[in-house]
């Protein structure tokens, strides 16, 4: 099996070929996802909520993400593997480099940072030191206390224009990938068309280059409230996890998921 690379993702964008990605936290699920055809995985700081039982991602540490990154890498050696930089782990460019190096040594191919234009110096420094970076705009969970909860971002014209400008400058600074979370579909389309780098959406409609879901949402095992954009693929697959993942991939690649009911206007 060939290893998935960023050049492939860029080619898929040019070919308008949509791709499906998932979070993963252990070797067993990583292997299962890869065997069904998932080629991009994220060790998300969402592990704080899905695995550790916290009500936000803020308590997650670099050591936590590194531990799970090592496990996922062993389970899916050929996937393009992203790892989240946790809250306050990239407060300065120097701190970001130290922690990014730890995650890269753990097996990540790329690190993901949440934030706008204020991150440009950090992204530039990492890119110059051979650390690939994925940006993250829209609803950035590490900023939940500023946002006042998990709310759709970019609905007002000023906020939408600022998000688009942030996306442009992050790409100019050296970001190779962008996650866009919980934004209106029209804004997601503007960002996806404006950037030359691939854009992965979550709660951003079916107009982005790729889609990502937290694995617990995709399999319907999230306790309590589930996001509007999530879909329980396991419930549509007679309880067969492998069939659920294949269905997820098929619906993303076919532009079926996310549907209008999963989309913010």
UniProtKB/Swiss-Prot annotation:
* Positions of Mg(2+) binding: 45, 84, 114
Cofactor(s) the record lists: Mg(2+)
**So what does this thing catalyse?**
3-methyl-2-oxobutanoate + (6R)-5,10-methylene-5,6,7,8-tetrahydrofolate + H2O = 2-dehydropantoate + (6S)-5,6,7,8-tetrahydrofolate
- What EC designation does it have? 2.1.2.11
Superkingdom, according to UniProt? Answer: Bacteria
**List of catalytic residues:** 181
GO terms for biological process, alphabetical? pantothenate biosynthetic process
Q: Which GO terms describe its molecular function?
A: 3-methyl-2-oxobutanoate hydroxymethyltransferase activity; magnesium ion binding
Q: Which InterPro entries match?
A: Pantoate_hydroxy_MeTrfase, Pyrv/PenolPyrv_kinase-like_dom, Pyrv_kinase-like_dom_sf
EC top class named in words: transferase
Q: Does the keyword Metal-binding apply?
A: yes
Residues where 3-methyl-2-oxobutanoate binds:
45-46, 84, 112
Note on how the cofactor is bound: Binds 1 Mg(2+) ion per subunit.
Q: Does the keyword Metal-binding apply?
A: yes
Instruction: Name the keywords, alphabetized.
Output: Cytoplasm, Magnesium, Metal-binding, Pantothenate biosynthesis, Transferase
User: Where located?
Assistant: Cytoplasm
* Annotated Pfam families: Pantoate_transf (PF02548)
Q: What pathway does the annotation place this protein in?
A: Cofactor biosynthesis; (R)-pantothenate biosynthesis; (R)-pantoate from 3-methyl-2-oxobutanoate: step 1/2
> Record's HAMAP family?
PanB
Subunit info here reads: Homodecamer; pentamer of dimers.
Role noted for this protein:
Catalyzes the reversible reaction in which hydroxymethyl group from 5,10-methylenetetrahydrofolate is transferred onto alpha-ketoisovalerate to form ketopantoate.
Q: Its family? A: Belongs to the PanB family.
What PANTHER family does the record point to?
A: 3-METHYL-2-OXOBUTANOATE HYDROXYMETHYLTRANSFERASE
Q: What is this protein called?
A: 3-methyl-2-oxobutanoate hydroxymethyltransferase
Species for this entry:
Yersinia pseudotuberculosis serotype O:1b (strain IP 31758)
Q: What gene codes for this chain?
A: panB
């Amino acid at each position: 099996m060939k290893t998935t690379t960023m050049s492939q993702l860029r080619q898929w964008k040019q070919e308008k070929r949509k791709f499906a990605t998932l979070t993963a936290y252990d070797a067993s699920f990583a292997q299962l996802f890869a065997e069904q055809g998932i080629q991009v995985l994220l060790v998300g700081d969402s592990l704080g909520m899905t695995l550790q039982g916290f009500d936000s991602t803020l308590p997650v540490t670099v050591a936590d993400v590194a531990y799970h990154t090592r496990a996922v890498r062993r389970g899916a050696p050929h996937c393009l593997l992203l790892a989240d930089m946790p809250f306050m782990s990239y407060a300065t460019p120097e701190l970001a480099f130290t922690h990014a190096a730890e995650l890269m040594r753990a097996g990540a191919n790329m690190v993901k940072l949440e934030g706008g234009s204020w991150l440009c110096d950090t992204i530039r420094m990492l890119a110059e030191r051979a650390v690939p970076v994925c940006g993250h705009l829209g609803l950035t969970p590490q900023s939940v206390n500023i946002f006042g909860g998990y709310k759709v971002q970019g609905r007002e014209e000023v906020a939408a224009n600022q998000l688009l400008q942030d996306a442009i400058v992050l790409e100019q600074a050296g970001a190779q990938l962008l996650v866009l979370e919980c934004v209106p579909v029209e804004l997601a389309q503007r960002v996806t068309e404006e950037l030359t780098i691939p854009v992965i959406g979550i709660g951003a409609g079916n107009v982005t280059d790729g889609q990502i879901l937290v694995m617990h949402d995709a399999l319907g095992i999230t306790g309590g409230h589930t996001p509007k954009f999530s879909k329980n693929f396991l419930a549509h697959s007679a309880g067969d996890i492998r069939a659920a993942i294949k269905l997820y991939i098929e619906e993303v690649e076919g532009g079926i998921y996310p549907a209008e009911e999963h989309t913010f206007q």
